[in-house]
């Protein structure tokens, strides 16, 4: 059993890792006022683990969290990784798991968002963009929580918008 003191960050780790890295840089720097304990530091799941094992590990991290941050990029809404149908143990004819686990066809993102809502976590949706475009956000959190852009234009140069993120996180 964990105390809910952590911040859980979800997103497209293949395409939007730079946004996650920006959050960590702001958190680790004494120059910025962002301060959070990352829930992903609690327990690691190997990328070679079964989807159901990874979801169990994600659930443990969410159980220790009070805040859920979702990074929304170009492809976040379309991500499908994590569903049982993509596991070698899944029998598509019968719709069952060959290892006897419960079948869960949700992606990791959908699983994380739904658990954050069910657990009553503070939800923050940060868009890897200069604008909030809710059509890119997974439907389950589209109208929940605080939504804010992570980027801004200064002249002709695109920068991370620390002030927008800090105001959203609080």
Residue ranges and their predicted role:
Residues 15, 76, 131:
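Surface-exposed, flexible loop/turn segments at secondary-structure boundaries
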Residues 79-134:
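Amphipathic helical hotspot of TIR/SEFIR-family domains
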Residues 1-67, 170:
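Conserved N-terminal substructure of TIR/SEFIR domains
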Residues 11, 72, 125-127:
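Short beta-strand/turn micro-motifs composed of small residues
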Residues 68-69, 123:
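Short, well-ordered beta-strand core segments
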Residues 21-22, 83, 135-139:
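Short aromatic-enriched loop/helix-cap "lid" or pocket-rim segments at secondary-structure transitions
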Residues 4-6, 127-170:
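C-terminal interaction surface of TIR/SEFIR-family domains
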Residues 30-57, 74-89, 94-103:
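Conserved BB-loop
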